[in-house]
Amino acid sequence: MNRKAENVNNGVYSAQSIHAPANFLAKGNVDTWFLLIVMAISLFGMIMSYSASSVYAEMYHDDSTYFFRRYVLFFVLAVLMTAPFVVLARPWQWRLFAMGAYAVSTLLLMLVPVIGDEYGGAKRWISFGPISIQPSEIAKVALVMMLALYMSRYEKKIDDNGKEGFFYGAFIPLCMTGMLCILTMLGKHISGLMIIGMLGLSIMFIGGTKSKWILSFIGLIAVAGVCLILILPYAMDRVMTWINIDEADPLGSAWQTLQGLYAIGSGGLFGRGLGNSNQKYGYVSQPQNDFIFTIICEELGFIGVIIVVGLFALLVVRGFHIAKNAPDKFCSLTCYGLTIKVALQTLMNIAVVTNMMPNTGIALPFFSSGGSALMLQIFEMGIILSISRYSNVKR
């Protein structure tokens, strides 16, 4: 293998290739299909943001377009912020970004219990003037990229079948994941903890950690999860409401879930029609947030659900395609991880609103209201698009 090929495989580029005027821009075009899918999901999310939020926005903000305008504003800002990275960023620069993002997210998670804003009895947000961010969301991206960097750097040691393989392939990645999980748990963010844990295990598995260690960790995590539920009163309350939904207080802890199920059940095959939801009139609380999927079901019916789920499925398939053809292992693991993150959050949100799992307060990517979350989601897709420019597939 010549020096140039070796540098490409390691995600490192020579000074000549970095600074040459002819190569100033990233070398190829972005993956067009992935870009179109992201645009389609975002447009769908924009439309449903207005439809689901109009009544609530009129009641509390005297402006039915309040959340819609926020969505458009943050979407435009996200695109403007992300576009330069897509065009200019090179794989070795994303490696530097991974280290910085992991350090920043760890620091922010440490600050949440101290200066975080409390909503619903939990501290998950930090405000910087008019903008609020959820550090656990940044931590998910940071963990994916940092583990991708680590697993690609120590690939040979991870592949060892002895103690070295356990130390480099299991112990250290587990510590990196576990630290963020513990810090997230301090903010009473169970869904964030679950996703961070699953992302960590996913990257470890794809990155080459032995299956026996993965299975052992899954067993330990399951035991730890049961213990947490027994120890934490708020977690136990949600689990008991989920198990005994028919006996739970329909005007109290079970209200949101039951009203969401009513919305889903009333949609039928074709739905009531866009904008014609009944449940958004104060029945489903803040319908533009975590339970926006129920409004999609009610207004667009089963056909609308198939379209939404189909778009997310296409995004996952195309994301995996980009990951498979990425220029090096770091880029590949990063694309796999960021794609899996979207898939996990989508599946968990749908599972919550359909009462297949306890209500954990998890948003539907690209649909649920939240400016900083939307900007981060667009940026994540931008990372994948940036890497797609270096695809090994000839175009």
Model-predicted segments: where are they?
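A juxtamembrane structural motif centered on a specific transmembrane helix
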Residues: 1-25, 347-395
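N-terminal membrane topogenic signal
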Residues: 22-38
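Short linear Ser/Thr-Pro motifs
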Residues: 42, 49-54, 191, 277, ...
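Gly/Ser/Thr-rich beta-alpha loop segments that engage phosphate groups in nucleotides
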Residues: 47, 118, 123, 267-269, ...
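TM-adjacent membrane-interface loops and short helices in multi-pass inner/ER membrane proteins
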Residues: 245-289, 293, 300-304
